[in-house]
Amino acid sequence: EQARLLLRKARQDSVIVSRAVGDLEIADEIVGFHVQQACEKCMKAVLCARGNSYRRTHDLQELHDLLHDAGVALPDALRELVVWSPFAVAYRYEDWSATPPVDRVRAESLVRAAIAWTEGELPAEDTG
């Protein structure tokens, strides 16, 4: 099922974020990109599991709005997800130097919370 695939992919992004916490050779832009990607996939997984469609987008605010319209509220701990949208495209191709450094520990915590939230929103996996 697509929702489970998206969750698995979010977990893959989470591995990169976790490994980057202590590895300053990994650029902040890369860390931010994988935070954004994990959060995007989590939000899309929940939408997909509920039968809601979404267009191809990296805009976390748009996905947040779709979740809201579908009656799904992000937990307070995840409200800041939307600020990671620029990492999907803009910060991959623009000068990063004018932007504050990424709080990697906070980023890892946010991704873990997003994955835990998604796991709770998806129906139980059929182990048949």
Mark where each language-model region is.
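Terminal alpha-helical segments
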Residues: 1-128
